[in-house]
UniProtKB/Swiss-Prot annotation:
GO biological process, one term: dTTP biosynthetic process
PANTHER family per UniProt: THYMIDYLATE KINASE, UMP-CMP KINASE 2, MITOCHONDRIAL
GO cellular component entries: cytosol
Pfam families registered for this protein in UniProt: Thymidylate_kin (PF02223)
Family to which the UniProt record says this protein belongs: Belongs to the thymidylate kinase family.
Molecular function GO terms recorded: ATP binding; dTMP kinase activity
Name the UniProt record assigns to this protein: Thymidylate kinase
Role noted for this protein: Phosphorylation of dTMP to form dTDP in both de novo and salvage pathways of dTTP synthesis.
InterPro entries per record: P-loop_NTPase (IPR027417), Thymidylate_kin-like_dom (IPR039430), Thymidylate_kinase (IPR018094)
EC number(s) stated in the UniProt entry for this protein: 2.7.4.9
High-level lineage: Bacteria, Pseudomonadati, Campylobacterota, Epsilonproteobacteria, Campylobacterales
HAMAP family on file: Thymidylate_kinase
KW Nucleotide-binding (keyword) present: yes
Claim: ATP-binding is one of the keywords in the record: yes
Length: 195
């Protein structure tokens, strides 16, 4: 089984992944994009943490390189091992669209399909959404921002809107959860969905 957690930075994906892992401590493989492979860790550093400045187009292709490597080394084995992944191609498309480069969504979908071995994976998607005010509060309390988060609140809210649209366009039946609520209530909904 393959489970993707989606949502912008600060919605609680990591918290919910840890809660799910603690309940089902069978051998789930927990992974993430970017950074779920050795190459991915290096790309994550360039994309999110380094002072290295790259163009938005180069950024898009580095995320795609990470996704292709992650698919080949990790995700394509989800028929043999249960995998929980923090982010998916949905994030890749949503963030790329928010960069205001006039990219075509169908081109982005096709590029991501190439990175994913030619098709969208059969998976369960959990989409955590948050209000602008709660996101502001959470990000302010966290304090430490990566290069993407530094683009600001409006940018992240635009990404969240893009994610909703991508799920509709691709007809992905994601479990959409209001991340403004109680952590334990959110966890209950996720647990029920994953069963």
């Amino acid at each position: 089984m393959l489970i993707f957690f989606e949502g912008i930075d600060g919605v609680g994906k990591s918290t919910q992944i840890e809660l799910l892992k603690s309940v089902y401590n069978k051998n789930y493989l927990i992974t993430k994009e970017p950074g779920g492979t050795l190459l991915g860790e290096k790309l994550r550093e360039i994309l999110l943490e380094s002072d290295f400045k790259i163009s938005k187009t180069a950024e898009l292709f580095l995320f795609l390189a990470d996704r292709a490597e992650h698919f080949e080394k990790v995700l394509k084995f989800s028929d043999k091992k249960d995998i929980i992944c923090d982010r998916s191609f949905v994030s890749g498309i949503a963030y790329a669209l928010a960069n205001e480069q006039n990219l075509d969504i169908n081109d982005l979908i096709n590029l991501n399909k190439i990175a994913l071995g030619g098709k969208i994976p059969n998976a369960k998607f959990i989409f955590l959404k948050i209000s602008k005010d709660n996101l502001r509060f959470r990000l302010e309390n966290r304090g430490n921002f990566d290069k993407i988060e530094e683009r600001g609140l409006e940018y992240l809210m635009k990404v969240q809107k893009n994610m909703s649209e991508i799920f509709k366009i691709l007809k992905i039946d994601a479990l959409e959860i209001d991340a403004n609520g109680d952590i334990n209530e959110i966890h209950k909904k996720i647990k029920e969905f994953v069963k």
